[in-house]
């Protein structure tokens, strides 16, 4: 009988040891993720429930591990992101979509700004994401929380965990070198390059540039070293600017095969191929070449009207001129956020959902966010 009890005790101790090891492993993996969740803060309080939040990413992540996972489609992209941000947990997210306007302006004091409207017909809260990767540049960036079903991210543990994916689903941002990037949707067939290079998806390209590019030129060369997979069944292009004012549109040639990356200097961009702007008319869709010419023209008109006296107000006037009200039939309607990135002093001013008199200011170096109006 004593031998039986001894064996039972040994089995129980073995089970307890396994459980303890598992708990230690889980706690080791999730300690900094728990810290990240703890840093979450609500910055606005609107009656409609769609707000601006901030989060300081404390956990180490490996962008290379995500890319090395092998992205072939939306599902493998999502699986790769979840494996890195939420290991050991069964969480589901959906692939995001994006619309928008973006532009570069150098003010009369020499400050370089990127103005950015994020337009999408489905309402969303926004997460301001601070990242400081150990092998990359510090950055601020913005994620649409509706894409992870977490418009109120601190509501429950499921939404808090889903928000940990935010570094890899950002739609625009700026790093400590003064490089800003934004993604904008197009109307063409999604690019899916297959030339033998490692594959990145749309939002991973944004994280790649923010973490590793010190200039627009470096960003372009980085993107050239990867094959692009456009996620969510849509095509996209990128707008990149830097502290010198080098603003370029990054597009994958719609008339080429394989669709070669082409960078085109431009003051502004919306939802049409900038290199084919002669084929694009305002207030209509222009087949594969895109739409949104009227917003592009509106931004340039503000630039022309205020030429010689550019200030931060010019940035806001341009964004207001291109902002859009909700339209359930237009995917790139309904401006969700507007941001003036200052590539020179490394700060950003943010307005959520066209609340133009309610501006939140954030500073990249100090990670301080304050209401400025």
Q: Which stretches of residues belong to each language-model region?
A:
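A short secondary-structure junction signal
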Residues: 126, 192-195, 248-253, 261-262, ...
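Extended amphipathic alpha-helical segments with heptad-repeat/coiled-coil character used for oligomerization
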Residues: 233-279
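Long, charge-rich alpha-helical interaction segments
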Residues: 288-314
